[in-house]
């Protein structure tokens, strides 16, 4: 595998190097991640996540896996929906992000199971979860196809995968969006997080992520029987929903 190439932002790297490079980015941004999310999206990320939570139709006692759960925004929402009789796992491949998320939830009085987990090799049994979610994490994974197959594997029949991710913006807005992403975003990263390079990577990773229709097909190829998506904020983000029959 070491000889195969993949992208890290706009750069080309060996597949076995990407995970380490992505880890460096998120170790760097973890402490300022929530602040930067608010600044970068003008608070819209909260609206996108709220919409995602309302889409799930969870019931008390359900089991949920939050992949690349980061600072715990979705896990908090899922825990409120499934109640004490339910089960919500907060997972992330990055220890710094997972620590921030765990501590944040503990400070709010929420005790959830956490796992340092690779989405391409999930440490959970087949047909276990009612819902799997991944928000703003899929684009950083080296083998997205393998990760999607793992998400399918751990879902119960009738279970749902929700993928909230940056996507392809409507064409008339591309110029303004590029200016914001590549001129302003790294500057904000430098001023607020003292880290322009990491936010340059994040902007590049968004452009390299599959568009809405491509991701839909990838989910179908991974085994999902029904897939659709909903664009938000002119396509800046899309919520893909896959169902396992």
UniProtKB/Swiss-Prot annotation:
S-adenosyl-L-methionine binds at residues 71, 92, 118-119. It is an enzyme of class 2 (transferase). Keywords: Menaquinone biosynthesis, Methyltransferase, S-adenosyl-L-methionine, Transferase, Ubiquinone biosynthesis. CDD domains: AdoMet_MTases. Pfam families: Ubie_methyltran (PF01209). It catalyses: a 2-demethylmenaquinol + S-adenosyl-L-methionine = a menaquinol + S-adenosyl-L-homocysteine + H(+); a 2-methoxy-6-(all-trans-polyprenyl)benzene-1,4-diol + S-adenosyl-L-methionine = a 5-methoxy-2-methyl-3-(all-trans-polyprenyl)benzene-1,4-diol + S-adenosyl-L-homocysteine + H(+). GO terms for molecular function: 2-methoxy-6-polyprenyl-1,4-benzoquinol methyltransferase activity; demethylmenaquinone methyltransferase activity. It comes from the Bacteria. PANTHER family: 2-METHOXY-6-POLYPRENYL-1,4-BENZOQUINOL METHYLASE, MITOCHONDRIAL (PTHR43591:SF24), METHYLTRANSFERASE (PTHR43591). Methyltransferase required for the conversion of demethylmenaquinol (DMKH2) to menaquinol (MKH2) and the conversion of 2-polyprenyl-6-methoxy-1,4-benzoquinol (DDMQH2) to 2-polyprenyl-3-methyl-6-methoxy-1,4-benzoquinol (DMQH2). This is Ubiquinone/menaquinone biosynthesis C-methyltransferase UbiE. It comes from Neisseria meningitidis serogroup C / serotype 2a (strain ATCC 700532 / DSM 15464 / FAM18). The lineage of its organism: Bacteria, Pseudomonadati, Pseudomonadota, Betaproteobacteria, Neisseriales.
